[in-house]
């Protein structure tokens, strides 16, 4: 053991220090003679406390001298900005700027970590120092790029001739000047007015200039080089997230937040602060955002919004099985932020003093306004400071963004040393007490879902009874006429007794089962209700958190029983993916279906909880979002809230939102390796996803696959702009391959969607992505009739909107080709016969909803034939890709008698409705033939009449 003042380094810390001393002496042999005994002792402590500091100081031994020569003195934050601008002012190459910024960042981070670990400064000051450093680095990079780009492209100006700057909103902890050691930084880029550049070799629109500048700035800060990175940059809080432009004007920001701003974006904007020197534009921007964040009235709706956000975080903790998380766990750092920001959102419209980004400042203001008692303020601040100090030290050990307590003894010792704690046990006790205190204040302010004691009545006896006669007597006493329930329950209990679920799990199960039985006996046939519920329980017996969730939430138990009874498909989903149980907690939210237009923004919000660079977690989050939204749709379906047409609408628009994010993720992954083609960006990628089949016809069902075709608009021989450039065609091929991979990879939450690419030109043997002109030529010159039929049910789903228009024109041109009706009718009928021969498998007396004569496929073929036969005369037939609206147009054009159109539409919707219902019951898509003849015989007559040869 070695003393540092009155503190002691453990043996493991000394071993770590010795390793760094050996490395240091290799690169600086005079180290021990150059440093005093006291300096050596302090450096030994630093080496033992932090691998990050050890690595950096061995790489840059000259920093040790600088640090001991005064750099460890109190930080003067204004010096960061001056030093950085001086450091890079004369540099002319971006790579040199990157290196300079990274070296400066690492030196200053070592300095701040040193001061933190050895208690040179309180944590509040440390957070201010880190925030000032980050802000100075961002602004130095921005200013260098602006000057460099103005020389190249001219200065962006407004219509009145005023130079336009790039303003950067710091969000989250950077905005609040409370940045922790290894945090990423959330930024939003904006500029005041549209216009053009002036004085360059060629003019550019201001937005184009700033998007290019923003891309370079993110790269300048975020890219990992031999010197490391400056800060990880997260741009997902901007309007429309990753699918939106990287930079928008003030007016664009204002329009977005007025028309589409979400509650979570209000919450995020509380912390928003313009970085860098203040100007009139900064005042203008804050004035523009204020009405969105702070309402003129006292806004208690903020409480419910924050409560929902907290529930989402709790779900994420459970789903990712996060333990010992001092940020997201109950009583963690996030709950303090929720408490303070709930008051800010509720009362900030009336109390200007609350409109501040700093949590410390806001909480003091709440006391001065009488909104929080002194004891509450004192306890919250004290507990928050403990957690922020632990978080900061935890991250400074190895410059890693983590809020999870250590899983090894050495790192616990490293935390205990600066916090004057004897050991892990004492420090854990201090942390736990802080989190209990915070959680109490959170529940008092924002509210939670803590359970109340439940009166278990007779079901507690029933669950614990050992003998058949006692069990049957209890059932008779309670007038439950279902003897099979006891038989099933006792058999299941015996099976469970052999499972290894641990004492906590068994205790929770014993509390849960009486409560669950109370729900089961309200069903018409409790024993039948128990069977699917038991399958769910089987899957979560070893996941005690989910047993506790059901135990503590009456709404979840009620929904579990009712939904499992209503749909075996839902029961299977809950059993296969227990994280869906979170969706059952609040029935009002379960049946509050996401509106059709909100799926993209809901998914963007959902993905914000996952680190942008964690590909595995991003893939898992996409699957979890799909599963949870699909469950909500199914719950509304089985309870009759949604008719079949709307079920398909919701499933289709959910898929579209997911396609958008998959394409964006694939784009970033391929671009990070190879760069991107010229004149492209995530919002202008020269790439399009075309949906065919049920996706194209807006008719997806549960478990539908996605029929996709990929197009790109780049011709010629250009290459990408990355360090490993490839030709543009190869880039789009890699993009398509990556998209398919992201869909098909099986994670713990399964496959995202099964993707069918066989409708692309030349089918499975063709290229995975087609240049749009080649695609058009193929359709007009080489495609079969069945490919033109498929085109009827196709539409642009996501991508570059310039390609959307080109695809729409191309589709219309092909559909409007004049065809010989006799030849067409024969080709359509032959294809239908071929399909039936390959796909129809029914027992005598059974009707296959899709493939039997008079079924779904016949109705689809009628629509496709009539479009292909008549679109050359009636261009309106090329507008829609769904059968229902095609029949409407056919009736309006008198190409189909209105009675026939109505009958086909009604039968089509009825067959799809039955198919949905059978899917939810986990039954094959077949019915007794007698139950459908009245409807389908008429379809057969219409089919034969229209396709008569």
Swiss-Prot record:
Underlying gene: glnE
GO molecular function, one term: [glutamate-ammonia-ligase] adenylyltransferase activity
NCBIfam families in the record: PRK11072.1
Region listing for Adenylyl removase, in residue ranges: 1-450
Species per Swiss-Prot/TrEMBL record: Shewanella frigidimarina (strain NCIMB 400)
Catalytic activity: [glutamine synthetase]-O(4)-(5'-adenylyl)-L-tyrosine + phosphate = [glutamine synthetase]-L-tyrosine + ADP; [glutamine synthetase]-L-tyrosine + ATP = [glutamine synthetase]-O(4)-(5'-adenylyl)-L-tyrosine + diphosphate
Required co-factors: Mg(2+)
E.C. code: 2.7.7.89, 2.7.7.42
Protein name: Bifunctional glutamine synthetase adenylyltransferase/adenylyl-removing enzyme
A Pfam family this chain is assigned to: GlnD_UR_UTase
Classification via HAMAP family: GlnE
């Amino acid at each position: 053991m070695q003393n540092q003042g009155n503190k002691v380094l453990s043996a493991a810390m000394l071993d770590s220090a010795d390793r760094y001393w050996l490395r240091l002496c290799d690169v600086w042999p005079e180290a021990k003679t150059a440093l005093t005994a006291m300096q050596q002792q302090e450096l030994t402590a630093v080496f033992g406390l932090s691998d990050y500091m050890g690595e950096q100081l061995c790489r840059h031994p000259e920093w040790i001298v600088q640090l001991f020569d005064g750099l460890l003195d109190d930080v003067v934050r204004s010096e960061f900005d001056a030093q950085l601008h001086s450091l890079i002012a004369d540099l002319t190459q971006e790579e040199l700027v990157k290196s300079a910024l990274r070296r400066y960042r690492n030196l200053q981070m070592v300095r701040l970590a040193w001061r933190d670990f050895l208690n040179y400064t309180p944590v509040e000051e440390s957070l201010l120092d880190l925030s000032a450093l980050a802000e100075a680095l961002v602004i130095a990079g921005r200013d260098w790029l602006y000057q460099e780009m103005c020389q190249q492209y001219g200065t962006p100006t407004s219509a009145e001739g005023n130079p336009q700057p790039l303003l950067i909103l710091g969000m989250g902890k950077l905005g609040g000047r409370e940045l922790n050691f290894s945090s990423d930084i959330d930024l939003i880029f904006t500029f005041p007015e549209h216009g053009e550049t002036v004085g360059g070799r060629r003019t550019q629109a201001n937005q184009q200039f700033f998007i290019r500048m923003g891309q370079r700035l993110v790269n300048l800060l975020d890219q990992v080089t031999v010197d490391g990175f400056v800060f990880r940059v997260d741009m997902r809080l901007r309007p429309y997230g990753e699918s939106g432009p990287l930079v928008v004007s003030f007016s664009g920001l204002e329009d977005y937040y007025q028309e589409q701003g979400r509650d979570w974006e209000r919450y995020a904007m509380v912390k928003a602060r313009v970085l860098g020197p203040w100007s009139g534009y900064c005042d203008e921007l804050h004035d523009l955002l204020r009405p969105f964040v702070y309402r003129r009235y006292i806004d208690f709706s903020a409480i419910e919004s924050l409560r929902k956000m907290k529930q989402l975080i709790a779900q994420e903790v459970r789903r990712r099985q996060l333990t010992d998380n001092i940020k997201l766990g109950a009583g963690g750092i996030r709950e303090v932020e929720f408490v303070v920001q709930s008051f800010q959102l509720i009362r900030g419209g009336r109390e200007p003093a609350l409109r501040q980004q700093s949590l410390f400042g806001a909480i003091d203001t709440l006391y001065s306004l009488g909104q929080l008692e002194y004891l509450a303020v004192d306890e919250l601040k004290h507990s928050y400071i403990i957690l922020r100090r632990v978080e900061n030290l935890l991250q400074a050990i190895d410059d890693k963004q983590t809020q999870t307590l250590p899983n090894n003894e050495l790192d616990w010792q490293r935390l205990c040393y600066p916090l004057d704690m004897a050991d892990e046990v004492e420090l854990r006790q201090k942390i736990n007490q802080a989190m209990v205190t915070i959680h109490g204040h959170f529940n008092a302010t924002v509210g939670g879902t803590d359970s109340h004691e439940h009166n278990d009545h007779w079901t507690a006896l029933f669950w614990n009874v050992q003998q058949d006669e006692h069990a049957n007597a209890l059932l008779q006493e309670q007038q439950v006429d279902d003897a099979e329930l006891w038989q099933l329950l006792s058999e299941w209990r015996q099976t469970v007794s052999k499972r290894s679920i641990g004492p906590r799990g068994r205790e929770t199960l014993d509390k849960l089962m009486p409560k669950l039985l109370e729900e089961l006996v309200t069903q018409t046939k409790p024993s039948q209700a128990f069977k699917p519920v038991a399958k769910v329980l089987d899957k979560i017996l070893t996941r005690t958190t989910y047993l506790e969730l059901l135990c503590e939430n009456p709404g979840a138990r009620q929904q579990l029983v009712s939904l499992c009874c209503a749909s075996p498909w839902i029961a299977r989903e809950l059993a296969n993916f227990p994280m869906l149980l979170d969706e059952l907690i609040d029935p009002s939210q379960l049946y509050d279906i996401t509106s059709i237009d909100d799926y993209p923004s809901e998914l963007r919000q959902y993905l914000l909880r996952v680190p942008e660079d964690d590909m595995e977690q991003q893939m898992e989050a996409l699957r979890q979002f799909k599963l949870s939204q699909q469950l909500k749709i199914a719950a509304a379906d089985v309870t009759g809230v949604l008719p079949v047409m709307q079920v398909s609408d919701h499933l289709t628009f959910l898929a579209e939102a997911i396609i958008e994010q998959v394409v964006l993720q694939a784009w970033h992954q391929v671009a990070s390796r190879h760069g991107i083609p010229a004149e492209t960006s995530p919002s202008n990628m020269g790439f399009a996803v075309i949906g065919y089949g049920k996706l194209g016809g807006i008719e997806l069902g549960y478990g539908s696959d996605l029929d996709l075709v990929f197009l790109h608009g780049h011709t010629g021989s250009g290459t990408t702009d990355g360090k490993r450039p490839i030709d543009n065609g190869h880039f789009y091929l890699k993009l398509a391959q990556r998209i398919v991979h992201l869909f098909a990879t099986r994670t713990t939450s399964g496959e995202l969607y099964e993707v069918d690419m066989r409708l692309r030109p030349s089918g499975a043997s063709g290229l995975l992505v087609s240049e749009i002109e080649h695609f058009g030529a193929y359709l007009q010159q080489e495609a079969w009739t069945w490919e033109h039929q498929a085109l009827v049910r196709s539409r642009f789903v996501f991508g570059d909107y310039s390609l959307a228009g080109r695809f729409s024109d191309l589709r219309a041109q092909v559909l409007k080709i004049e065809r010989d009706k006799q030849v067409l009718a024969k080709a359509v009928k032959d294809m239908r016969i071929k399909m039936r021969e390959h796909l129809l498998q029914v027992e005598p007396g059974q009707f296959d909803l899709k493939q039997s004569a008079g079924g779904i496929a016949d109705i689809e073929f009628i629509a496709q034939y009539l479009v292909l036969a008549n679109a050359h005369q009636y261009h309106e037939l090329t507008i829609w890709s769904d059968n229902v609206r095609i029949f409407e147009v056919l009736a309006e054009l008198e190409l189909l008698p209105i009675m026939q159109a109505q009958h086909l539409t009604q039968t089509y919707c009825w067959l799809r409705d039955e198919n949905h219902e059978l899917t939810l019951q986990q039954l094959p898509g077949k019915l007794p033939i007698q139950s459908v003849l009245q409807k389908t015989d008429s379809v057969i007559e219409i089919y034969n009449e229209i396709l008569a040869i």
